């Protein structure tokens, strides 16, 4: 099978790594990719938001499956263009991707499907914002209605900060604060059938102890030793299947990866948000534990044959990923700094630990930083303690001037 992956982050590196290990994959391509993906896939320069260009590239390569990684191309309808050319594509239509592209749309779908979520108001002017903030009280939760690379949400006790964030957006969703730990659960769907993956937990704040501003994610781990063993089945029945059914009822079936961001509250499971693609950095730990070949799973979803797929197989091992970010992230990051220690990790820590590239590029023989989140250092182990130790041992080998990372990823879950 010839596969083309669209994107260039650590999520896409994780996807490409798993696909490169799949014996059914005979040729692997990625556009635009990054310095790490270049080691496992042939790279192509293309505008990931240009559906016609992506479709032309897929046709030229003879791709039998196209996997669209990031949210922006999905919302822009890239999967539609590929699908219209008769090429199987893993990723929802632009209309279905509105589940992520518009939080107000997602709230409407959840209301119609009876999916449990936070009470909320959609606000388009300061008066509506003030009324909503007063209705719910602190902590205030204000979400940009559109895409914001994981940084469009403000949770604060400061009403002025909440107002300022709302006023900087065209339309916001103001909602009640949900207590309890957060869980990310991915499900592969062909628009009718749902296959859940294993749950993970990510760390959204920039600093240890969940302090600092929100980011795209600073680390993740799986499995969740503290979670109810029935959690996945419960979420499939109360959240994922009803949402997929409602999207199909609306005439916009959702095919691809449906990501439910959940809060395990004192009143039960509540949906915080939906995403229309694999999450980053959770994908790094979930795929590290998936034993079922990835290409067949994605192809089954892309072609409507998920019901025929055998049950997914999982490793009993734990996985931890730690994100190494540039100086000043999540503000404007410093880029162009050389990265050292990558060969050392490959020589001394493989196969239990490895580095997935995000914001990197090749510059001569060197690899340099090219974005905010630069690397995802991922490790597996018999339990979270071993996986965590291996991940941080590998992180310590990496040199990047001014870089930052959290030191407490999976610490509480591992009992550290």
Curated annotation (Swiss-Prot):
Alphabetized UniProt keyword annotations: ATP-binding, Ligase, Magnesium, Manganese, Metal-binding, Nucleotide-binding, Purine biosynthesis
Binding of ATP, residues: 133-184
This protein's record includes keyword 4Fe-4S: no
Catalytic function, reaction form: 5-phospho-beta-D-ribosylamine + glycine + ATP = N(1)-(5-phospho-beta-D-ribosyl)glycinamide + ADP + phosphate + H(+)
Pathways involved: Purine metabolism; IMP biosynthesis via de novo pathway; N(1)-(5-phospho-D-ribosyl)glycinamide from 5-phospho-alpha-D-ribose 1-diphosphate: step 2/2
Binding-site list for Mg(2+): 273, 275
Example of a GO MF term: ATP binding
UniProt domain ATP-grasp: residue ranges: 107-303
Pfam families assigned to the protein according to its UniProt record, in alphabetical order: GARS_A, GARS_C, GARS_N
Its EC number(s): 6.3.4.13
KW Manganese (keyword) present: yes
Family per record: Belongs to the GARS family.
Protein name: Phosphoribosylamine--glycine ligase
Organism this protein belongs to: Streptomyces coelicolor (strain ATCC BAA-471 / A3(2) / M145)
